[in-house]
Amino acid sequence: FMELIQHYNARLRPNESGVREAALQKNLYVDNCIVGADDYGSVMPHVLSNFVNIVTLNYQIGVLYVQNPPRRVLESLQSALDGDIEYKGSSYVKLTRTVLKTIYQNLDNDVLGQDQCKKQILSGMYRLTTGTHGKPVVLMLYGPSGVGKTESAKSISKSLGGELLRIQFSMMQTEEAFNYVFGAEHSKSSLARDMVGRESNVILIDEFDKVNPAFYNAFYELFDEGRYVDTNYDIDLGQAV
């Protein structure tokens, strides 16, 4: 994809590219074009808004793979190519009673003591086993340092087959942190981008009580309905923990 963008930019500014204009006007044939999740941050905003026009202008692509597209890219694709789009998403481990037993066994091995807390964690997660619950399970682990809060989250994530996504909220005290949570420029790191690329369906928001209360507004819809929306992404977290 980035090679295609370089060719596109050279076509816009042939005098600066050093490439003969006749060569730039030739159609390019590509069997497979892959747009990785990190590629969006390497291009200008107009590339996202005109994504379909750019990738189809004088380019013939057999199969276009687009990973975790921002909203503008997805809407551009849906508007022009909706009937030709095949959607594939990550599949996370489905929570069943058997999986709950595994979670409890791992918690027992990984975290010393806290027997009542472990039972309450399992009780909170049980509703996801019905398969009809469209909201995430929100668990508040509260207590002094060293009692096993973070280790419990890591253990649950391990049981569900992936590395824990850990968001360190004690660092969220600047304007850059505000942009990270609510989304700003597509080229910047964001909470939404991190969540859409997570390995497991377990997200730890560490030291949630240490942040400016203004940040809590970003989580009301997530906790209530399982959706997280910022300026670039709209994410379904309905079965997350």
Task: Locate the predicted segments by residue.
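Walker A/P-loop
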Residues: 1-2, 133-167
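AAA+/SF3 P-loop NTPase mechanochemical coupling elements
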Residues: 22-25, 57-61, 196-198, 231-241
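Pre-Walker A (pre-P-loop) alpha-helix and adjacent loop at the N terminus of AAA/AAA+ ATPase modules
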Residues: 97-138
